[in-house]
Regions:
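N-terminal auxiliary segments of SAM/dcSAM-dependent transferases
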Residues: 1-22
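SAM-dependent methyltransferase
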Residues: 11, 146-206
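Conserved alpha-helix/loop element of class I SAM-dependent methyltransferases that forms part
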Residues: 40-59
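Conserved SAM/SAH-binding loop
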Residues: 67
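Conserved SAM/SAH-binding beta-strand->alpha-helix loop
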Residues: 87-88
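Conserved SAM-binding strand-loop segment of SAM-dependent methyltransferases
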Residues: 98-108
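A short SAM/SAH-binding and catalytic strip from SAM-dependent methyltransferases
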Residues: 114-134
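A short glycine-rich, Lys/Arg-flanked "PGG" loop and its adjoining helix->strand segment in the class I
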Residues: 134-146
Length: 234
């Protein structure tokens, strides 16, 4: 990984913001990811993110913390947050912005337990493939304290496969339709392609049942997205 996301965050933090990140997938054309959006405050966050932050309780793990916006909001509420990201640049920015407990780490490296685990901005993305979902969910389950919760958002992207007549052109012989090849470039540098997973709610719920987690659809967004709360079976 070249960490172009981290470089973009560092450039913005250091006053060197001149252009945005360009993204695309194997089923969509190029799009712009505005870097200022990654530094948004609570009032500018989508309603699903706002809802998730309002549901937070206890000791928190912010997974894929990026520039630290969610962590800073919670810190300012007096909540203790551990913030992790695989991007060294992102964690450097978090430290500069005053995030108290930020470190470069993968979720699979974490062993301590939390009351709330946050996975936002398509939190299922880090699962990569449908076949990996139960592995990640089992690990996340092991990180929950009794009465703990996982707050995670994603989208059902089936709509991206609709043709003009409303029919679907999903290849039934291909992988799950939410598994995408995700491409990023910044200032002419291309990131190593990622596999990024968008997961419809029913598929997430079924995977949770497999590993012994309850899965509740807390709120639906305006564009096939949703916020789910996962809890331990009592």
């Amino acid at each position: 990984m070249k960490d172009i996301l981290g470089q973009a965050l560092l450039d913005y933090q250091n006053g060197n913001y001149t252009e945005d990140i360009i993204t695309s997938t194997n089923i969509s054309d190029e799009d712009i990811l505005p870097i200022p959006y990654l530094f948004r405050e609570f009032k500018d966050m989508p309603k699903l993110e706002q809802k998730a932050l309002k549901l937070v309780k206890g000791h928190v793990l912010d997974v894929g913390c990026g520039a630290g916006g969610h962590s800073l909001y919670l810190q300012n509420k007096g909540i203790i947050v551990k913030s992790i990201d695989i991007s060294e640049g992102a964690i450097s920015v978090c430290n500069t912005r005053g995030v108290n407990h930020a470190e470069v780490a993968s979720i699979l490296d974490i062993t301590e337990q939390f009351d709330t685990i946050l996975l936002l901005m398509n939190g299922t993305g880090i699962f990569e493939k449908l076949s990996y979902v139960t592995k990640y969910l089992s690990h996340l389950k092991s990180l929950l304290k009794p009465k703990g919760q996982i707050l995670i958002d994603s989208s059902d992207i089936q709509y991206m496969y609709e043709d003009e007549d409303g029919g679907l052109w999903i290849d039934t012989n291909a992988n799950y339709y939410g598994e995408l090849d995700y491409y990023m470039s910044y200032k002419g540098v291309k990131e190593t392609p990622l596999t990024w997973l968008y997961l419809d709610f029913e598929t997430l719920k079924n995977a949770c049942l497999t590993v012994g987690l309850n899965c509740e659809n807390v709120q639906e967004g305006e564009h096939f997205d949703y916020l789910a709360k996962l809890t331990l079976n009592e």
